[in-house]
Amino acid sequence: MSSLQAMKTLSLVLLVALLSMERAQGLRCYRCLAVLEGASCSVVSCPFLDGVCVSQKVSVFGSKVRGENKLSLLSCQKDVGFPLLKLTSAVVDSQISCCKGDLCNAVVLAASSPWALCVQLLLSLGSVFLWALL
């Protein structure tokens, strides 16, 4: 085997190894809590072997107050309630979507409301409930 063939073989093996390492790191998801318009999210590797990326859109009082959580979970939990909000008679709509592709939870929900601080609190509570389901 000539040194040129050996170099080509070594390069091919190295390329395959590098491509495999990227996939071995697992699913990558956006992660942020209480996202409002213009906020950015960090990219994290999902710690779960067969996890999912999650995007939770929350609107309070109809569409006046809106925001979003993004994270990774072990499995898709579509039925997340807000038990503390039942005491306040707030109308809360939560939509959860799950996906399994890298950075697939990228869609950001726009927000335009003076109730932004209220949404941040509600979204933080919603994300705590999501994590508690694990």
UniProtKB/Swiss-Prot annotation:
Keywords for this protein: Cell membrane, Disulfide bond, Glycoprotein, GPI-anchor, Lipoprotein, Membrane, Signal
Disulfide bond positions: C29-C53, C32-C41, C76-C98, C99-C104
InterPro entries: CD59_antigen_CS, LY6_UPA_recep-like, LY6H/LY6L_nAChR_modulators, Snake_toxin-like_sf
Removed propeptide positions: 106-134
Membrane topology: Lipid-anchor; GPI-anchor
UniProt domain UPAR/Ly6: residue ranges: 28-76
GO MF: acetylcholine receptor binding; acetylcholine receptor inhibitor activity
A cellular-component GO term for this protein: synapse
GPI-anchor amidated asparagine-type lipidated residues: N105
Coiled-coil residues: none
Pfam family, one: UPAR_LY6
Compartment(s) of residence: Cell membrane
Stretch forming the signal peptide: 1-26
GO BP annotations listed: acetylcholine receptor signaling pathway
Protein name per its UniProtKB record: Lymphocyte antigen 6S
